[in-house]
Amino acid sequence: MKNKYDFKLVEEKRNEKWQKKGFFIAPKQTKKPFSIISPPPNVTGQLHLGHSWNAFIQDSLVRYHKLQGFDVLLLPSVDHAGIATQVKVEEDLAKKGIKKSDLKREEFIKKCYHWKEKQYLKIKEQWDKLGICYDFSKERFTLDQDAQIAVSDFFIKLWEKNLIYRGQKAINWDIKLQTAISNIEVINKPVEQKMYYLKYFLENSNEFLTVATTRIETISSDVALAINPKDKRYLHLVGKKVVHPLTKKLIKIIADSNVGSDFGSGIMKVSAHSILDFEIMEKHNLESKDCIDNYGNLNHEVPEFQGQNRFFARDLIAKKLEKEGFLAKIETVISNVGFSQRSDEIVEILKKPQWFVKMDELAKSLISHLNSKDKIKFYPKNFEKNLRKWFEKIHDWTISRQLWWGHRIPVWYKNDEFKVQIDSPGQGWIQDEDVLDTWFSSGISVFAFLGWPQNFDLIKSYFPTSLLVTGWDILFFWVARMYFSSLFIMKQKPFEKVLLHGLIRDEIGRKMSKSLGNGLDPMEIIEKYGSDTLRQALIFNSSPGKDIKFNIEKLNTAWNLNNKIWNIAKYIADLDTFFAKPDLIDLWMENKIYILKRQIVKNIKKYNFSVIGTEINNFIYGDFSSRYIELIKTRKNGFYARKLLRKVLIILHPFLPFLTDFLMEKIFKMEILEQKMPRIRQFKENQKVENILEIIDNLRTYREKFQISKKIILEYCIINDKFSNAEIDIINKLTFGKWLENKELVIKTKNFEIAIKVPEELKKEQKGRELKEIQFLKSEILRAEKILTNKGFLEKAPREKIDLERTKLEKLKEKLAFYEKK
C-alpha cells in the first residue's frame, strides 16, 4: 500500500465493478425489503451539489441495510421536466438558427428526446463518480412508454371518479413561457411599486369613493366596487352605483366578506386578473372581461392603450385619470407580487379553459390518513403539520400546460364530441393539444416506476417503499402529490417514512446560485478531493430538515479522516499475522467498536447523520489511532488487529464506500458488499485498559510539561494499586518508563496517585530556577521595603495604595520563606 491516501487509485473503476458484479440488482424478495425510489433529476443539465447530497444519503442508507441483510432496491430515474426541458431545447435550437415554430410537433419532440439521451448519459457518468448503488436494470424515465400508459391510466381513473374536469377559470399564466402554471409554482416576492388612489363618483353626485390599487392597468375590466358587509362606513352604499373613471359606465357597489377593510380605503375594485376578484364575480353573477392578452399587453377592451405592455401602460392611464380628475394621489409601497418559479417572470391571472383536478376529496383522504396510526412518519415531524395546513386550504390543481414536450392529455375531440381514452377513437378524432403538468406524472412515480398498472411483481415486493429522501422545498410539489395519488390508486401510503433535508448554502448562509457565483460543481470537487470526501462533507453535516453551510474546510476535514483510516489500515496490514488470542487491549478495542456500531444503529434510525459523523471521527482519531494503534505498538503481531480492522471497514462502508471497498479487497482479498454487518462482543472489563491509558496520559503529560527527553527513563510507581507485570510492561513501553517504588513527587489523577522519581537533570534545572526565583524575590522585597519607608510616599499616596504595597510585601516574604525552607 502507498504511504499516503490516493483517492484516484482507490475510486478508479470501483463503481463499475459493483455494477458488473450486480451487487445492487434487487432480487425477487426473499428477505425483508428496503426500497427507495430516487427523486428523478431533470434532464435539463448536470447534477448539482444538492443532487449529490440527496443521492449520498440514499446510497448510504441502502448500503447500510444491505449489510444488515435486507433485500435492497434503489431505483434510478430521470424526469422529462416539461417546461424546463422545452426551454432548454428551444435555446439550443436558437443557437442553430432554428425556431420551435419552424418545426412540426413530432419533429420538435424528437429533438427533445435527443436532448434527453445526451443529458442522461452525462447524469449517469456523474452517478458513477458519486458511487451510487442504483439498480440500473430497473431504470425509468417519466416519459418512457410504460410511464405514458400509467399517466394516461391515472388521468382516466380520476376522470371516471369525476375528479378531473375542464373549466374556464382564473389561472396563473406565464407570459414568457406561454403556459398555465399551478399555484405552488408561483413565488411571491416583495416589490416596490406605486399605489394609485382612484376616485369613483357616486351616480348623480359630486361625492366620490376612494379606491387604492397597485394594478391600475386592469381598471377597464372593473365590473363593481366591493366592501366588507361588516364595514359600517360603507354599508349604506351597497346597491348604489358609481361612475367608472375610464369608461364612464355605471358599476354596482356590492358587499362581500372577502374584502379586507384594513387595506387602502377598505373599498376594493372588482376586476379581471385576480383570482379573488374572479371568485367574487362568480358569487355575484358578474360578467368578467379580460383586458390583458396572453403576452401581457392591453387588449381591445382598452382601445386607447391597446397593444401597450401592461406595466408601461400604468403611467399612461394614471396621467389620463389625473387630467380628468379621477386620480387622488400616488404613493410608493412595498407589496408582494407573484413570479413564475419556472421563468422568474411576473405571473398574470387570466381566465382560460384548462384541465383541473378536484382536490377536496383527495385532500380529505390524505388528511384522514394523517390522522390514522398508519400515517407516513416525517423526519423532522413538523413537516407533517405543514402538509396538513396546506391541504386544509388547497385549491383545485391546474394540470394542463400549453407545451409540446410532456404527456399529452388523453382526450380526443371530433366536432362537438369528446372522449377520454388512451388511443385514438378513429379517423377524424383530434387529441387535445395540451400536455400535463410535470408533477402530474411525477406524482405517480412511486408506484408507476414499480410497474403499475401493467406489472405488479416489484409492487408486491417493494411497495409501499421504505423511505423517500428529498428536499423540503418540494414537499408540496412532489411528496404531497405522491401521497394522495397513492391513496387514490393503491389504497395505501406510498412510503413508510419521509426524510426531508434542507438546502446547501455557502459559508455565510446564502443559497448557492449561478447569479451569486457561489455554486460548486460536485464533479470538480470529486476531481480534487474524491467522492468519499465529498460524501463525508455532506452526510456528516446532515440533520433532518436542516440546511448545510458548505465550505472547503469541511472537505479538508473529511479528507484528513480518510487519510487517517488509510494510515491505520496500512500499519495493521504491515504487522505479522501469526495466530494469537486476543489480549486485554484487543478486547477493549472490540468493545469500542461495539459502542460505535451501537451509536450508528441508534442514530441512523433517526437519520442523525451529523451525530454519526462525530462518533466516527472520535472513534477513528481517539480510540483507534491515538489509543489502540499506540497500545499495539508494544507488540509485532497484528492477527487480531486485522480482525478488528475488517469489522471497522464493514461498519464504515455505508459512509466511505470507495475506501472501505478498496481496503477490504487489498488487505483481505474479499468483497465488502458480500459481507454482513459484523456481530461484535461487548467486553465488560474495560476499566483495566482505561486505567492503563489514564496512567500513560498523565506520565506523558508530565514529560511534555517539563520537556523531559525520551532518552531519559521516567521512573514511577502507582501508590496503593496493583498492576500486573503485563500491564506495567505496556505502560513502560509507551511512556519510556520504568517501575520504581518511590514517593518523591506524587501526582494525583482522576483515579490514582502516581509517584515519580524526579530525574537528576530535572532536579538540577529546578534548583537553578529556584535560585533565580529567590534572587528575584529578595530584590522585590527590597523594592517594597524602600517604598514603604519613604515618608513622601506615606504622606501623599492614597491609603488603598499603601495597603496594597504592604500586602504585596507580606506575600513576597511568605514565598521567599517557602523556597528557603525547601
UniProtKB/Swiss-Prot annotation:
| EC category name | ligase
CDD domains the record matches: Anticodon_Ia_Val, ValRS_core
Q: Which GO terms describe its cellular component?
A: cytosol
Q: In its keyword annotation, does this UniProt entry include Coiled coil?
A: yes
* Pfam (any one): Anticodon_1
Q: Where does ATP bind?
A: K514
- Motif segment ('HIGH' region): 41-51
Q: What is known of its domains?
A: ValRS has two distinct active sites: one for aminoacylation and one for editing. The misactivated threonine is translocated from the active site to the editing site.
What this chain does, per the entry, is described as: Catalyzes the attachment of valine to tRNA(Val). As ValRS can inadvertently accommodate and process structurally similar amino acids such as threonine, to avoid such errors, it has a 'posttransfer' editing activity that hydrolyzes mischarged Thr-tRNA(Val) in a tRNA-dependent manner.
**Which family does the record claim for this protein?**
Belongs to the class-I aminoacyl-tRNA synthetase family. ValS type 1 subfamily.
The protein here is known as Valine--tRNA ligase
